[in-house]
From Swiss-Prot:
InterPro entries named in the record: DUF7197
Coiled coil feature spans: 158-187
Composition bias type Low complexity, residue spans: 182-193, 217-226
Record's compositionally biased regions (Basic and acidic residues): 172-181
Stretches for region Disordered: 172-197, 217-240
Disulfide-bonded cysteines: none
Name of the protein described by the UniProt record: Uncharacterized protein L507
Record keywords: Coiled coil
Highest taxon of the lineage: Viruses
Length: 259
């Protein structure tokens, strides 16, 4: 199979359609074919990779997609999470959030997402030993994310630290919810105060039990009290009109001639 990309010919040793096809018969772009081909080669090496992903996306694992997404996007950022992994016989530090951001910058959310969104694909996996066929639906972004997460021990790390990651997600979500509710309550309180009038109720004023009424003084506003944002938002005049300084009145004698 051949595809033209950046004026170079890319050759695929095996037609990707043997394992992956578009759910809605959409055509794959050259970039999508590259991503799918890479993921196909990875998942085809061991059935346990496919089963690990399927347990999570089907809700059969203790790890949920939401927790996995929280770990790479939030928890790892807040805690600067890293660990050592061996690549090419060499141990390197793997900084989770930095690597996650690198993947996002390289692929965008469309092609790197733990959730099954955007273009859907039907994937067929045949076990080389048992010859069992596994078929499931995913997306290009989801396949690419799980390939990265499994290859770089992300899922293994989350398994070992699942409880603390879940607690962090719940606590942070709770605080953000309370903060939002407090902000909304403050806005309502401010709007109520603005609606209160200083004018006396006429029905109350008719009561003989009232000896005196004190009204709060009317607040005076001036142009000097305008906020900086008001001044900044004022549109600048590009040219001046001759009437900017008012209309001047002049007295001139008028002479009318009649033929």
């Amino acid at each position: 199979m051949h595809n033209e990309l950046n004026n170079h010919t890319i050759t695929y040793s095996e037609d990707i359609s043997n394992n992956i096809s578009s759910k809605n018969n959409e055509k794959f772009t050259p970039k999508e074919i590259q991503i799918l081909d890479k993921n196909k080669k990875f998942f085809s090496t061991d059935i346990k990779y496919v089963l690990t992903m399927l347990k999570i996306i089907n809700g059969e694992s203790d790890i949920s997609i939401r927790v996995l997404d929280w770990f790479v996007a939030n928890y790892s950022k807040k805690n600067n999470t890293y660990y050592n992994i061996k690549k090419n016989g060499k141990c390197d530090r793997f900084y989770v959030h930095n690597e996650y951001k690198n993947q996002l910058n390289g692929y965008s959310k469309q092609y790197f997402d733990p959730f099954c969104r955007k273009k859907k694909v039907a994937y067929k996996y045949t076990d080389k030993i048992s010859k069992n066929v596994i078929q499931f639906e995913s997306s290009i972004g989801q396949l690419n994310f799980f390939q990265w997460a499994i290859r770089n021990k992300i899922i293994r790390y989350v398994e070992l630290h699942l409880k603390i990651i879940e607690e962090d997600m719940k606590e942070t979500t709770k605080k953000n919810k309370e903060k939002k509710q407090n902000s909304q309550s403050q806005e309502i309180s401010n709007s109520i105060e603005m609606e209160v009038s200083d004018d006396p109720d006429p029905n109350i004023c008719l009561s003989s039990s009232i000896n005196s009424i004190c009204l709060s003084p009317v607040k005076k506003t001036s142009s000097a009290s305008k906020s900086d944002s008001d001044k900044k938002n004022k549109r600048q005049q590009l040219s001046k009109s001759v009437y900017d300084h008012g209309i001047k009145k002049y007295d001139y004698p008028i002479q009318l001639d009649f033929d």
